[in-house]
UniProtKB/Swiss-Prot annotation:
Cofactor binding, per record: Binds 2 [4Fe-4S] clusters per subunit.
Name under which the protein is recorded: NADH-quinone oxidoreductase subunit I
Membrane topology: Peripheral membrane protein
NCBIfam families: NuoI, PRK05888.2-3
One biological process term in Gene Ontology: aerobic respiration
Positions contributing to [4Fe-4S] cluster 2 binding: 94, 123, 126, 129
Superkingdom of this protein's organism: Bacteria
Any one Gene Ontology molecular-function term assigned to this protein's record: NADH:ubiquinone reductase (non-electrogenic) activity
The protein's assembly and partners: NDH-1 is composed of 14 different subunits. Subunits NuoA, H, J, K, L, M, N constitute the membrane sector of the complex.
Gene Ontology cellular component terms for the protein in this record: plasma membrane
Length: 205
């Protein structure tokens, strides 16, 4: 077995160093037609009105249920109470160590969450906190338009928890699950035709 490697020497083009040489290089490339080919391609597509640009913010692309944006704390649909039971699993599994919560036991003996904060300066949006939550209390929402002076404006409990007014107006969207498909998933999947012939020679699809 021959273990010797064979190297091939490729002669590279010498880049011009002087100003005159660079100007000549630009002139040669312009005359050769590379510049005009690109301009003609842009002009042709513009005249055909073959535009694929999304006119944001008037037009917005649909987001997949698996999209991981700013976190949201959900409420129970039956009573409107907070779903979070203060188990602390999200705080323990967070690999960025950016989740903090303060809990205590109330008069009814149930654990209550007083403070729940996420440091979005360290969060990498891995989604582990949402996956491990047994009550689907913390999920990743679709809110990606987050213009603010500080990241802390989105990481407090009162910012992430569904407001009661919006909840009463049925404004809380249920989390479809990590395996959920997008609404237009069928149009994006290339379907393979399953055509075969029966013994009688009739074609079935």
């Amino acid at each position: 077995m021959d273990l010797k490697q064979k190297y091939i020497f490729i002669e590279g083009t010498n880049c011009p160093v002087t100003v005159r040489g660079r100007l000549l290089q630009v002139f040669r490339r312009s005359v050769s037609g590379e510049l005009f080919k690109g301009l003609w391609l842009v002009l042709r597509e513009m005249l055909r009105f073959n535009i694929h640009t999304t006119q944001y913010p008037k037009e917005k692309l649909p987001l997949s249920p698996r999209y991981r944006a700013i976190h949201e704390l959900l409420r129970l649909l039956e009573s409107g109470n907070e779903r979070c039971i203060g188990c602390g699993l999200c705080e323990k599994i967070c690999i960025s160590n950016c989740i903090r919560m303060e809990t205590s036991y109330g008069e009814d003996g149930r654990k209550k969450v007083h403070e729940y904060t996420i440091n979005f300066g360290r969060c990498i949006f891995c989604g582990f906190c949402a996956e491990v939550c047994p009550e689907l209390a913390i999920v990743h929402g679709g809110r990606y338009e987050n213009a603010s002076e500080q990241r802390a404006h989105f990481g407090l409990k009162e910012d992430m928890l569904t407001p009661m007014e919006r909840f009463m107006n049925q404004g809380q969207k249920e989390f479809p699950g990590f395996g959920a498909l997008s609404q237009d998933a069928d149009s994006k999947v290339k379907k393979t035709p399953l055509a075969y012939f029966t013994p009688k020679g009739e074609e079935n699809v």
